[in-house]
């Protein structure tokens, strides 16, 4: 019994070894757990996260700003020819019209040599102007535009209307010689007037309406349009107005087949998949800021994005336009 007691109280070496083994296993597990915990990554301090975010934002803004500036610069030195096709009921032979508007003293090449060369290569039958070749507030020196007119008049007959910037020079700066200078440079200026041209044995009537839609009843435009409406002795009638909203507000009540306008600079900013952003007449997301439209009288209205811009509102994602209209 004494031996049994001693055996129970003091286990044999095998039992001691078993107990130690169990104890050692637990210690090993405990050691692994402690070691794993010591290798865990420490959390990034909040100030570093804020700094990294700011650096990324600055980099993105720099890239965006650079792309924006590049786009603005491109739109000041490049333009595209936009081609339009319309059908006339009476023309016996097709004709081509080149429409320029809103140049705002801009030059493409020395003395606009690039623009003149492109117009010449298009071989137009008529060259029509939509106004705003000058810029009000930048003096009365527009000799470069007069030189352009002289060069264009050597290619084809040139006629057109004045824009709001010419009107402001004429009335506010008292530049009463403006119309005379345009005329001397080869432009037939239409101020609520008609001009007629014979192209390939077809008579083409050009109507030029002056001012803005608000002026229609006050300064002779309404009287002029009423006076020419009964005429039928022409093969094609084109109506010019600087402001495009003139057409849906007033002019679509009269007979013509093609309307041409500018003024909007294509909405200044053109948003992808949305279109023009803003015009003075229509506000945000305008309806008439560039492209082709069908009016209530079934005439086609073409609103050119124009060839220039004012220094206060540069174009963004909005390439200037030289309009080419083929009529058959």
Each language-model region and where it sits:
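N-terminal membrane-anchoring alpha-helices
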Residues: 1-91
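Solvent-exposed loop/turn segments at secondary-structure junctions
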Residues: 104-105, 133-136, 164-168, 195-197, ...
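Mobile, glycine- and charge-enriched loop segments
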Residues: 74-109, 221-241
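Membrane-embedded segments
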Residues: 94-188
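Binuclear metal-dependent hydrolase catalytic cores centered on His/Asp/Glu-rich metal-binding motifs
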Residues: 173-187, 199-241, 247-249, 312-315
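Conserved beta-sheet core of the metallophosphoesterase superfamily
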Residues: 244-323
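Active-site neighborhood of phospho(di)ester-bond hydrolases with catalytic His/Asp-centered motifs
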Residues: 100-101, 126-132, 157-164, 190-193, ...
């Amino acid at each position: 019994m004494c031996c049994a007691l001693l055996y129970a109280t003091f286990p044999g070496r095998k039992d001691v070894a078993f107990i130690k083994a169990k104890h050692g296993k637990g210690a090993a597990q405990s050691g692994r757990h402690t070691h794993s915990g010591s290798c865990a990554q420490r959390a990034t301090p909040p100030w570093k996260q804020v700094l990294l975010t700011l650096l990324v934002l600055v980099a993105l803004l720099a890239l965006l700003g650079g792309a924006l500036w590049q786009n603005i610069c491109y739109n000041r030195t490049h333009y595209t020819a936009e081609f339009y096709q319309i059908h006339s009921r009476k023309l016996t032979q097709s004709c081509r019209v080149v429409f320029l508007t809103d140049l705002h003293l801009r030059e493409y090449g020395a003395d606009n040599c690039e623009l003149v060369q492109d117009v010449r290569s298009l071989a137009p039958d008529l060259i029509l102007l939509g106004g705003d070749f000058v810029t009000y507030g930048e003096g009365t020196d527009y000799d470069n535009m007069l030189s352009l007119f002289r060069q264009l008049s050597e290619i084809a007959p040139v006629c057109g209307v004045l824009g709001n910037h010419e009107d402001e020079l004429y009335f506010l700066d008292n530049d009463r010689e403006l119309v005379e200078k345009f005329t001397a440079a080869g432009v037939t200026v239409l101020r609520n007037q008609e001009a007629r041209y014979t192209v390939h044995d077809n008579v083409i009537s050009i109507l030029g309406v002056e001012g803005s839609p608000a002026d229609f009843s006050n300064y002779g435009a309404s009287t002029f349009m009423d006076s020419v409406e009964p005429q039928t002795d022409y093969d094609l009638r084109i109506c010019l107005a600087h402001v495009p909203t003139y057409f849906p507000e007033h002019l679509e009540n009269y007979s013509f087949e093609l309307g041409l306008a500018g003024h909007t600079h294509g909405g200044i900013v053109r948003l992808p998949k949305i279109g023009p952003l803003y015009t003075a007449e229509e506000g945000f997301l305008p309806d008439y800021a560039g492209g082709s439209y069908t009016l209530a009288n079934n005439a086609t209205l073409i609103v050119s994005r124009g060839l220039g811009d004012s220094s206060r509102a540069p174009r963004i994602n909005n390439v200037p336009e030289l309009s080419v209209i083929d009529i058959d």
